[in-house]
């Protein structure tokens, strides 16, 4: 009987982290944006879309300065 409750607890835990939480844990969803929302050459970064040539470092979009 104890094994059944352990199995039930694990199953409930696994189903509770699916969806948005699992995507956020895997880094696929960040700040409400997913990669599809940002476009092909952009990525979600700290709640905003960070596009090329900028880079996402520690959840912050670092804007590359233009050469001119």
Curated annotation (Swiss-Prot):
It comes from the Eukaryota. Expressed by the venom duct. Disulfide bonds join 38-49, 42-51, 45-56, 50-61. Residues 30-35 form a propeptide. Transmembrane segments: none annotated. The keyword Plastid does not apply. Keywords: Disulfide bond, Secreted, Signal. Residues 1-29 form the signal peptide. GO terms for cellular component: extracellular region. Its main location: secreted. Belongs to the conotoxin G2 superfamily. 1 family. The cysteine framework is XXVII (C-C-C-CCC-C-C). This peptide promotes cell proliferation (EC(50)=17.85 uM) and inhibits apoptosis (EC(50)=2.2 uM). Negative results: does not show activities on voltage-gated sodium (Nav) and calcium (Cav) channels as well as on nicotinic acetylcholine receptors (nAChRs) (at concentrations up to 100 uM). This is Conotoxin phi-MiXXVIIA. It comes from Conus miles (Soldier cone).
